[in-house]
Regions:
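Acidic, low-complexity central loop/insert segments
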Residues: 30, 38, 80-207
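Acidic, proline/glycine-enriched N-terminal capping motif
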Residues: 1-68, 77, 355-357
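Anionic-ligand-binding alpha/beta catalytic cores of soluble enzymes and soluble regulatory domains
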Residues: 171-259
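Short glycine-/aliphatic-rich beta-strand segments at the starts of folded cytosolic domains
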Residues: 29-52, 115-133, 250-262
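Glycine-centered loop/turn motifs
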Residues: 63-65, 142-150, 205, 210, ...
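Residue-level signal for inorganic ion chemistry
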Residues: 43, 93, 127, 238, ...
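Glycine-rich, small/acidic residue-mixed loop/short-helix segments
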Residues: 225-229, 239, 243-363
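Short, intrinsically disordered, mixed-charge
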Residues: 51-59, 103-111, 183-187, 279-281, ...
Length: 363
């Protein structure tokens, strides 16, 4: 059955969604991820250039090491998210906004020795439940939920840890996509759809650009400082807001996992309004939803940070309200695990608007 929405273009499932999830969780599945976009950046200045534009430390990225980064606007809102791996000559970027990202990067080349190309038409990604790089292939291994160097988390210290999952994307010529998948099936892999990948992603608290990000999203709200933001690197656009929210705390919203009442047959749709039980006032919205083979119906939702973490919520579905309880991903107090005890010299400058030149400051 074909997927819809953000996963349109590949299969939602192949007739046995529960078995497909179990196979994926057990490490013996293969997933068509050819709907994802691919952008390449070549040239001797590629790493230092991307480092200057993005939220991640990329200047010293070693070949074969997987990371991810964001392109932020001057207010620190998320514009693009990319998974990145360098093969020694080319940085490969896997993204859900390939055309927009490639256009933005191309505008920022100036006189630097870099070449940007959207290669989505020629290359495709295959998903596998593996936590190590593919030998002899360009592959990206998901770093989530490990806290990368320079990162931090907004998860509560006594909260439920994200479910562990192994996941990598192997890049192949698009002309070879079918034969590459068939070879894996011949070796014993089970073909799984995006129902399986989404269920395991949601259970892992893993945000996704196509679903959790909107025009006002801050990285802190989604716990994305784990893997996509380096707090101690040099200047980039949006850095002042990143530093300010990290130091002061209290981002406006927070990502949470919802355990939905499973008594109904249908699940709410992404975009469904979330309210407090007994209230009509919106507290947030559902961003991703799936039926997990063990946890049942689950969803990710972005809520107002002030929403009581212990409150029972109601999700306004097409067939009526659905009760939901919260599994906290981002602390309701809005403070990260390593929030500085008091502002230091750098923070003072940032708070006065005198920080990063890319944000219009006078650094």
């Amino acid at each position: 059955m074909p997927a819809q929405g953000a996963d349109a273009g590949v299969a939602w499932h192949y007739g046995e969604p529960v078995a497909e999830q179990r196979a994926l969780e057990a490490g013996r599945a293969v997933v068509d991820q050819s709907h994802l976009g691919l952008v390449t950046v070549k040239g001797p200045d590629r790493l230092t250039w991307l480092n200057s534009l993005s939220s991640q430390e990329l200047a010293s990225l070693a070949p074969g090491v997987s990371t991810e980064f964001m392109i932020l606007n001057p207010q620190g809102r998320i514009e693009h998210v990319a998974s990145a791996v360098d093969d020694g000559e080319t940085v490969w970027l896997i993204t859900e906004t390939a055309a927009g990202l490639a256009a933005h990067l191309d505008r920022m080349r100036f006189m630097l020795r870099v070449e940007v190309a959207d290669v989505t038409a020629d290359w495709a990604a295959i998903g596998e439940p593996v936590s190590s790089p593919a030998a002899g292939r360009v592959s990206w291994v998901d770093p989530w939920p490990r806290i990368a160097d320079g990162g931090t988390t907004y998860a509560p210290a006594d909260g439920i840890a994200p479910a562990l999952r192994s996941w990598r994307l192997v890049l192949v010529p698009r002309a070879d996509l079918v034969s590459e998948i068939e070879s894996r099936i011949g070796a014993g892999a089970v073909l799984a759809g995006t129902w399986a990948t989404e269920a395991l992603r949601i259970a892992a608290h893993r945000p996704r650009a196509a679903t959790e990000v909107d025009e006002t999203s801050l990285p802190h709200e989604l716990d994305w400082l784990r893997t996509a933001v380096h707090l101690h690197k040099g200047c980039y656009r949006g850095q002042e807001t990143v530093a300010k929210v990290h130091n002061v705390g209290r981002p406006p919203r927070r990502l949470t996992l919802l355990h939905l009442d499973g008594s109904g047959a249908d699940l709410p749709s992404p975009g469904a309004v979330v309210t407090l039980d007994g209230s009509d006032a919106p507290a947030g919205r559902v961003t991703s939803v799936s039926r997990h083979h063990e946890l049942g119906p689950i969803a990710l939702a972005v809520l107002k940070r002030s929403t009581d973490p212990s409150a029972t919520l109601m999700v306004v579905g097409d067939d009526g309200p659905v009760a939901a309880t919260q599994e906290i991903i981002v602390n309701a107090d809005g403070f990260s695990a390593d929030r500085p005890p008091k502002p230091g010299p750098t923070t003072k400058g940032l708070l006065l608007g005198k920080g990063c030149a890319a944000d219009g400051g006078d650094m």
